[in-house]
Amino acid sequence: MRVVLIVLDSVGIGEMPDAHLYGDEGSNTIVNTAKAVSGLHLPNMAKLGLGNLDDIPGVEPVKPAEGIYGKMMEKSPGKDTTTGHWEIAGVILKKPFDLFPEGFPKELIEEFERRTGRKVIGNKPASGTEIIKELGPIHEKTGALIVYTSADSVFQIAAKKEIVPLEELYRYCEIARELLNEMGYKVARVIARPFTGEWPNYVRTPERKDFSLEPEGKTLLDVLTENGIPVYGVGKIADIFAGRGVTENYKTKDNNDGIDKTISLMKEKNHDCLIFTNLVDFDTKYGHRNDPVSYAKALEEFDARLPEIMHNLNEDDVLFITADHGCDPTTPSTDHSREMVPLLGYGGRLKKDVYVGIRETFADLGQTIADIFGVPPLENGTSFKNLIWE
């Protein structure tokens, strides 16, 4: 038996009760995107029950639905990829990751400069493409490292490959990771951001590398691998979990590549396993850029390929589709939004047309997957296997 878990990065379905604390009242990524384009065409997710979850223009409610459906609330504080995925896997954060809207503290930057032997420029929240355009020439002249953050808990280091060789950049990231941990700053990811080319047409290269914080507790991935059930990550799963509990990981170029790799794993791995896929384009390419038209198109492209995924399920396999947070492209904010996420499930062993309600935590999904595999339970979450199992 295989479980295929697909996270549509940032595809939220309505504000959380505490959204006002995050400045996210009124956010509803799916519904507002559908309104912006006068209706979404998502017939395959509609069949599973997506239209039963909210009033989504173009996505009709279907009775009886072919799948199980519900929504999940986020119990952890925060609204980012790491927090969302950890919670799906059973780890609930007590305190949120640190954010640096004013840049990093002076003593941290000074110590980082001392340990790397290079000066730091930037030190502010910025768009990666904009900051290299702004500071690239100074970096080329002086060899100073471009350090910046975003609305997420990240410490990013950009450097031109011809000025700072890749291995050296990665070493600086390791220094930053150690230093943040030592000084007690809870930063989710340190990210190497190499670029090349000439000003003003610098291009970021694909050798981006994440140096993530390890999950604060045992995840579903740890429990599965400890019990002999491999976990195959597609996309940035290994980065999110700092490699822990991931048997093999397959990096992706874009959503379609992620779907291709998921399908080829389904064809290839005929043993008990979890195939855990993150499709990130919704978030990085369209949500943050407030581009509802392209966001809608990406949702429709995923939906059009859903039958291929379903066609490759064996009789006892289970497919779950969910998200990790919101990123409403129709609101003035370019940041993530604090939202509930949709949950759809399908498989030969699952009942049809079951509404699993609004779950109190994303961890209910991880707990259910642990229950399906018959491994020891996770620390958090309530399994709903009894509601959905034939």
UniProtKB/Swiss-Prot annotation:
It comes from the Bacteria. One of its GO terms (biological process) is 5-phosphoribose 1-diphosphate biosynthetic process. Its cofactor is Mn(2+). SUPFAM superfamilies: Alkaline phosphatase-like, DeoB insert domain-like. Its main location: cytoplasm. Binds 2 manganese ions. Mn(2+) 2 binds at residues 283, 288, 336. Its EC number is 5.4.2.7. GO terms for cellular component: cytosol. Keywords: Cytoplasm, Isomerase, Manganese, Metal-binding. It catalyses: 2-deoxy-alpha-D-ribose 1-phosphate = 2-deoxy-D-ribose 5-phosphate; alpha-D-ribose 1-phosphate = D-ribose 5-phosphate. It is found in: Cytoplasm. Mn(2+) 1 binds at residues 9, 324-325. GO terms for molecular function: magnesium ion binding; manganese ion binding; phosphopentomutase activity. Pfam families: Metalloenzyme (PF01676). Pathway: Carbohydrate degradation; 2-deoxy-D-ribose 1-phosphate degradation; D-glyceraldehyde 3-phosphate and acetaldehyde from 2-deoxy-alpha-D-ribose 1-phosphate: step 1/2. It is an enzyme of class 5 (isomerase). NCBIfam families: deoB (TIGR01696), PRK05362.1 (NF003766). Isomerase that catalyzes the conversion of deoxy-ribose 1-phosphate (dRib-1-P) and ribose 1-phosphate (Rib-1-P) to deoxy-ribose 5-phosphate (dRib-5-P) and ribose 5-phosphate (Rib-5-P), respectively. Belongs to the phosphopentomutase family. This is Phosphopentomutase. The gene is deoB.
